[in-house]
A protein has these predicted regions:
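Catalytic Tyr-X3-Lys loop
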Residues: 88, 99-119, 142, 159, ...
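Residue(s) in the substrate-gating loop at a strand-loop-helix junction
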Residues: 146
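Catalytic Tyr-x(3-8)-Lys segment
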Residues: 111, 203-223
Length: 253
């Protein structure tokens, strides 16, 4: 899929991995719609990114919000790329000092990370399937899982379950959408220098980076975005989960 001239939807595009992805796709010639929460910096980010960027406020778990973002994308042209970067996490033990893991907190993480991702996939794929193919492809969908899907740490039951679900649905969805000439690939990032880690002291962030075998540092969001661009451009990448983690395997805590 040629990025130049394509229209892309990026969820969570106002910060972190999503922002880097939006910047990368725009630099490669795409038009980008950022879908992020109303309280995010999405409007300011889109304004800064220029004429080919748009912001649509919404929640990935809402069918109407995602549909509205896709309608904004349709104003720019046929949707060709969707990148799921929206997500959240928590750190709660299955049984802690205050009792069992609150079920509403578990379902909240799964709903945003897993159900929200699938909601965007199904609605974006429906739009893509109605477009004319270009060089044998109608679209590319890239999802964001995590190494926590494989190496979940203490307190990550909900987060690991949500990201493991994204890993598990990648291949069947790719098979579902193959007849429509739509590819689906998932990236499982390791430790990246995102706003979430940016709240930690410098020494704590440096210590986390030293846990990565090579390169012994936190990942740069631009490196995630570069992989997204390669996935979009490489027609043989489909149904795969790619760990982007510097060979780290997380310890229990």
């Amino acid at each position: 899929m040629n990025i130049n001239g394509a229209v892309a939807l990026v969820t969570g595009g106002a910060s972190g991995l999503g922002l880097a992805t939006s910047e990368q796709l725009l630099e490669a010639g795409a038009a980008v719609v950022i879908l992020d929460l109303p309280g995010s910096a999405g409007a300011a980010v889109a304004d800064k990114l220029g004429d080919r960027a748009r912001f649509s406020a919404g929640d990935v778990t809402s069918e109407s919000d995602v549909t509205a973002a896709l309608d904004v994308a349709a104003e720019l042209g046929p949707l060709r790329v969707a990148v799921n970067c929206a997500g959240t996490g928590n750190a709660i033990k299955t049984v802690g000092r205050d009792g069992p893991f609150p079920l509403d907190q578990f379902t909240r993480i799964v709903n945003i990370n897993l159900v929200g991702t699938f909601n965007v996939i199904r609605l974006a794929a429906h739009r893509m399937a109605a477009t004319d193919p270009v060089d044998g492809e109608r679209g590319v969908i890239v999802n964001t899982a995590s190494v926590a899907a494989f190496d979940g740490q203490i307190g990550q039951a909900a987060y690991s379950a949500s990201k493991g679900g994204i890993v598990g649905m990648t291949l069947p969805i790719a098979r579902d959408l193959a007849a429509a000439q739509i590819r689906v690939v998932t990236i499982a990032p390791g430790l990246f220098d995102t706003p979430l880690l940016g709240t930690l002291p410098d020494e704590a962030r440096a210590s986390l980076g030293r846990q990565v075998p090579h390169p012994a540092r936190l990942g740069d969001p631009a490196e995630y975005a570069a992989l997204v661009a390669h996935i979009v451009a490489n027609p043989m990448l489909n149904g795969e989960v790619i760990r982007l983690d510097g060979a780290i395997r997380m310890a229990p805590r």
